[in-house]
Amino acid sequence: GVILDWVPAHFPRDTFGLSAFDGTCLYEHFDPRQGSHPHWGTLIYNYGRPEVKNFLIANALFWAKEYHADGIRMDAVASMLYLDYGKQDGEWVANIYGGNENLEAIEFLKHLNSIFKKEFPDALLIAEESTAWPKVTGELDDEGLGFDYKWNMGWMNDFTEYMKNDPIYRGAHHDQLTFSMVYAYSEKFMLSLSHDEVVHLKGSMYTKMPGTPEQKMANLRLAYAYQMVHPGKKLLFMGQEFGQEKEWNEKQSLSWELLEDKEHLQLKNYMAALHAFYKANPALYQLDEKPEGFEWINGMEWEKNLLIFLRRTRKKEDTLLVICNFSNVEYDDFRIGVPYPGKYKEMFNSDAESYGGTGVGNPRVKMSKKTECDERKNSITVKLAPLSVQVFSYTKPETGAASNKSAKAKTAAKAAAEKKTGKKGKPAGKTEEAVKAVKAKKTTKTAQKAEKKVSEKTVKTAEKKQGTTT
């Protein structure tokens, strides 16, 4: 699909554009406190004018109708919602109620989203909104703005800052990992590692990672896997999937030659496998917007840099146990509490050798034991790879009733087999008495044959003696 980055928040001052279009402030406000954005040096649309609103709405519909865009990501929505965004005292004008909310822009966004959804119900509307404005993805009839998703700027900033730290120091910043789950269900969020994070001397995702080249790759595999197992929809900026080393420059092509290196090719293949795993497991996306789709097992292991949690659907058998190790330490026989007794099998490991990792993992299925851990009655012991995400599937054990049923089935099957073939090679359908009768009959015949032979021998001997006497 194609999602357009659409900017209804402001426009440049270039005189060949919309600025002073007919020699007057046609699209912008006349008052610079309302029509100028000092933070970016741009002009702000006058959302109070019907002509301006119609122009913008028609433009959005044009992209969807004529170019079949699958969605629109609206840039800088926060700057539209607040009259004082990026401004100092005296640089902005309050609304009719004396507040800093831009009432005209709010009404414009609601109107736009309402019309757009009627025309293109399957297209996505995404807001890049960086504040705590309520109900950005709320329904229009519930005083919401009507967007499908909100860019999770908080997660993006916190997570990238956390990953920049050497694993030795990550424990002190553990809250940057866990805080996103405090507000994860307040909106319908989209997790994006976008162009904003790889421009303006911020470096690429690869250069943000600490350590040696091998550790950078391990950190990238960890980061992308964590993004996939975290609640919310996902977006990754181009080039980061194979470890682009330079930061993004719109005037240059991506460094495709990096794919000639084994490590970068392995990362690309890893991303393909990660996406396939995501699509194959509904627990990673089905209840993204519902609290019941996520459950902490242990989110407080800050000293070990560990996060352990569950992803769920409404089916118990779809449950996934996720273990994220943000340290560069390998843990042997690490005990973890599990939600149910049963079997746990490692289904995905970001540190697999095929992806360029160390290969530390759990090839054998783990059977839970009744040993309390993490405030749960059952637990398993696993081997944790350094800088990794490991995901385990769950299979319920056979219950007592099921075991008895299985045993009865085996007994019945055995009896049927004996009835068909006969026990210990006996003819099928023969009773014990019948078998004895057959044996007795054989014995009688043998005795009769022996008796006949003895009689014949006696007669011959007698005849021989009589001939000799004569």
Task: Put a short name on every predicted segment.
Residues 68-70, 85-251, 279-351, 358-359:
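Conserved alpha/beta catalytic core and glycan-binding cleft of carbohydrate-active enzymes
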Residues 78, 131, 396:
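Flexible, active-site-proximal loop/turn residues at the rims of small-molecule/cofactor binding pockets
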Residues 49-52, 56, 97-105, 212, ...:
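Residue-level preference for long, well-ordered alpha-helices that form the structural scaffold
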Residues 171, 214-217, 226-236, 240-470:
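Carbohydrate-interacting/catalytic domains
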Residues 52, 56-63, 108, 112, ...:
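Alpha-helical packing segments of well-folded alpha/beta enzyme cores
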Residues 1-100:
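Substrate-binding/active-site clefts of carbohydrate-active enzymes
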Residues 34, 44, 60, 177-179, ...:
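Hydrophobic alpha-helical segments, principally membrane-spanning helices and signal/leader peptides
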Residues 42, 210, 377:
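Short, flexible active-site loop motifs that bind/organize anionic cofactors or intermediates
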